[in-house]
């Protein structure tokens, strides 16, 4: 949580005239030839950064052992520097390796190349400037709304530094600042010379070095969201040699931009949106749900294979946000994922991601499938996280097991392996409390029918089977019987014949955004059917006789 600083904001002119937004384009012919719909931020490549803007630190290594640097000037081994990368910048903008120098040198960020504008002349034309420590905002929009935007960037800057690390200092000692251009009347900005002739077309926003351009938005929330999104790009990519792939660059810009401002003025970034009304104009959760409804669900591999051209449409922004949100909020994966924040300009980024995905491949694919199919506003990632525990079979000597299942968590392992073709008796007892408002609702294992979730009463105990890693699939659609999306109702109890071998997982049915206020646990007993248990005893006796 960060409080928005009360930074002085410069207001130098009266209200500017509003007009209907148009695509930024130098000519009608070019607009006709290049018009296309792009959602979210538009991909662009910054012009070359002068090589003298960045210095390096070299130690007493031989020339053949020279090291490269990450975004904070930390040295990388020659082995790490050879790892395969996919930089999201034009190769022409990537600086060549400076001559070897054994003397330590100070690392500086690239020089500030923002143009100097005549703010008084712009004010006379109807374009105001609002300035804080980190943002100089030029806009022709309403003064009251515009005045609050630069302090928001000052607040998110602190969150960037905490997550990614501080940028190297400027050569002249100045603070890092951006220019933002928030546009209602395109012609006004173009006539004022605030839109570069070589700036590619965009529908919502575009950035270049420490400048960004964005259109005025219908909703207050999405105006702030887009502002933070573009500013995040400026911060993440200002140092040369970006190694992080496009899904991470766009996903993290979306992730930081999802924010909530409290009544006391404090602001939270990287939040899970709670409702379409409070996050008006954003729509990423709806896009993911619509994608699954259209049988266009995306796997982790699909998302990480995307290139910049894929982001000429809006859906990849939603899926990239979803993957970053999932990995950063999940208690099992977030520590490893957050290490990537210091590797944006580091060639080790790709090997670190590969190690993360390889180490947790089966669990990741399983939980991503569940996350992306169950995603809803207010989704509780911590409560939904699964503690995977492989089960063991019941035996004639231990024909049953009893397991507590908490009401405030998602899927929980029973520790029992159900074998294909075997029939099991599952019984449940106990009472739990669902929600506190408008009053506490008590439920038994069969659930309560005053409210339903996924077409079942909330409070109903349900189960599913989780297969071993060698049976994993990374394809979330269609529903396969070997995935945890194929669940079944248990209630007070049921007789269940396993169609395939897997560990039994259980949970109390409730919306994924409502788990945190549930209390209590039910007791679940799992045992073989009488016939199967007797058959198992006969097999056990025959094996003992043979061994003797």
Task: Give the ranges of each region predicted by the language model.
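Bacterial N-terminal signal peptides
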Residues: 25-39
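Bacterial signal peptide processing site
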Residues: 40-45
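Post-signal peptide N-terminal segment of mature Sec-exported envelope proteins
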Residues: 49-90
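Beta/coil-rich, acidic/histidine-enriched accessory regions frequently appended to metallopeptidases
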Residues: 51, 57, 311, 343-421, ...
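Juxtacatalytic substrate-recognition/specificity segment
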Residues: 99-115, 122-245, 260-263, 294, ...
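Acidic/His/Gly-enriched intrinsically disordered linker/tail segments
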Residues: 123, 194-218, 222, 240-380
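Noncatalytic modules at the cell exterior or secretory-pathway interfaces
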Residues: 421-425, 498-510
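Surface-exposed beta-strand/loop patches in noncatalytic accessory domains
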Residues: 434-490, 532-544
């Amino acid at each position: 949580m960060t409080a928005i600083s009360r930074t002085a904001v410069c207001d130098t002119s009266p209200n500017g005239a509003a007009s209907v937004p148009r695509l930024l384009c130098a000519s009608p012919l070019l607009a006709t030839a290049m018009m296309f719909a792009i959602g979210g931020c538009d991909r662009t490549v910054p012009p070359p950064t002068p090589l003298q803007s960045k210095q390096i630190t070299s130690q007493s290594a031989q020339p053949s052992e020279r090291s490269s640097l990450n975004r904070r000037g930390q040295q990388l081994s020659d082995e790490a520097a050879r790892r395969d990368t996919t930089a999201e910048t034009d190769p022409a903008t990537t600086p060549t390796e400076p001559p070897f120098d054994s003397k330590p040198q100070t690392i500086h960020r690239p020089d500030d190349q923002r143009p100097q504008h005549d703010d008084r002349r712009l004010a006379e034309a109807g374009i105001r400037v609002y300035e804080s420590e980190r943002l100089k905002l030029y806009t022709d929009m309403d003064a009251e709304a515009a005045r609050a935007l630069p302090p928001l960037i000052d607040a998110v800057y602190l969150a960037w530094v905490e997550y990614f690390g501080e940028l190297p200092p400027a050569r002249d000692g100045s603070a890092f600042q951006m220019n933002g251009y928030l546009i209602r009347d395109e012609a006004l900005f173009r006539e004022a010379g605030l839109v570069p002739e070589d700036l590619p077309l965009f529908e919502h926003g575009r950035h270049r070095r420490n400048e960004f351009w964005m259109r005025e938005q219908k909703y207050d929330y999405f105006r702030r969201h887009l502002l933070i999104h573009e500013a995040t790009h400026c911060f993440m990519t200002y140092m040369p040699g970006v190694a992080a792939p496009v899904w991470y660059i766009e996903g993290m810009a979306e992730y930081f931009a999802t924010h909530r401002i409290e009544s006391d003025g404090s602001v939270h970034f990287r939040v899970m949106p709670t409702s379409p009304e409070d996050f008006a104009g954003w729509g990423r959760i709806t896009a993911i749900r619509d994608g699954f409804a259209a049988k266009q669900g995306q796997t982790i591999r699909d998302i990480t294979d995307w290139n910049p051209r894929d982001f000429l449409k809006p859906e990849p922004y939603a899926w990239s946000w979803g993957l970053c949100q999932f990995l950063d909020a999940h208690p099992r994966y977030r520590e490893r994922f957050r290490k990537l924040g210091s590797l944006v300009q580091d060639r080790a980024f790709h090997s670190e991601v590969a190690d993360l995905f390889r180490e947790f491949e089966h669990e990741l694919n399983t939980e991503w499938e569940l996350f992306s199919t169950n995603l809803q506003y207010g989704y509780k990632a911590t409560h939904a996280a699964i503690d995977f525990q492989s089960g063991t079979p019941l035996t004639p000597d231990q024909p049953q097991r009893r397991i507590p299942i908490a009401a405030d968590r998602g899927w929980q392992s029973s520790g029992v392996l159900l074998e294909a073709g075997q029939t099991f008796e599952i019984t449940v007892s106990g009472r739990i409390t669902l929600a506190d408002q408008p009053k506490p609702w008590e439920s038994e294992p069969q659930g309560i029918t005053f409210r339903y979730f996924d077409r079942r009463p909330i409070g109903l105990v349900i189960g599913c089977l989780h297969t071993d890693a060698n049976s994993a699939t990374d394809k979330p659609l269609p529903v396969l019987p070997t995935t945890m999306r194929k669940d079944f109702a248990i209630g007070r109890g049921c007789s269940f014949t396993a169609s395939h071998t897997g560990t039994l997982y259980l949970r109390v049915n409730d919306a994924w955004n409502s788990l945190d206020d549930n209390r209590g646990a039910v007791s679940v007993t799992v045992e073989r059917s009488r016939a199967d248990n007797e058959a198992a005893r006969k097999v056990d006796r025959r094996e003992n006789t043979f061994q003797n």
